[in-house]
């Protein structure tokens, strides 16, 4: 949905050229195929208190390992770029940062990827993210 909105509404969040659209699609596909599922598994295991059991710790370790390959790719890109596409915040950053947020509770994973960690902090320091997060925290449990 986010890609559709960026594509139809335009603006700086969306692609400015066909090449940028291809890159947005590439990074979004990485987010939903290689990052989202293992990151959500880490979040869910931790949320259920599984990080305090050997089984849960094992599940977290397996899913962290699944994230290392896409994070290495992301780290390499972010070593030379401030953002994923066009050196500006786009829907690609939004999509991938949100999927990666699910794994932020892992105690050491992001420390292995300093450029990714810095990029994620930049994405989450945006006023729009801060407003969204405040609204989410204000929702009833």
Question: Across the structure, where does each feature detected by a protein language model lie?
Answer:
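Terminal-tail/helix-coil boundary detector
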Residues: 134-141
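GST-like domain detector, emphasizing the conserved glutathione-binding G-site
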Residues: 1-68, 82
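Surface-exposed helix-capping loop/turn segments at secondary-structure junctions
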Residues: 11, 76-88, 127-132
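Non-transmembrane alpha-helical segments in soluble domains
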Residues: 2, 6, 25-28, 71, ...
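GST superfamily/GST-like fold recognition
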Residues: 34, 38-43, 84-109, 117-123, ...
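Structural helix-adjacent loops and short alpha-helical linkers that scaffold large soluble proteins
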Residues: 12, 61, 107-114
């Amino acid at each position: 949905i986010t890609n559709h909105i960026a594509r139809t509404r335009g603006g700086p969040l969306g692609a400015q050229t066909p090449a940028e659209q291809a890159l947005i699609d590439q990074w979004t596909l990485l987010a939903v195929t290689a990052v989202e599922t293992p990151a959500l598994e880490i979040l869910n295991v931790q949320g259920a208190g599984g990080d305090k059991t050997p089984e849960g710790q094992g599940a977290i370790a397996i899913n962290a390992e699944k994230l290392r390959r896409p994070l290495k790719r992301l780290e390499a890109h972010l070593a030379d770029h401030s953002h994923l596409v066009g050196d500006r915040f786009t829907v690609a950053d939004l999509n991938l940062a949100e999927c990666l947020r699910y794994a932020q509770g892992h105690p050491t994973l992001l420390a292995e990827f300093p450029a990714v960690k810095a990029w994620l902090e930049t994405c989450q320091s945006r006023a729009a993210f801060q407003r969204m997060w405040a609204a989410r925290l204000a929702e009833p449990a």
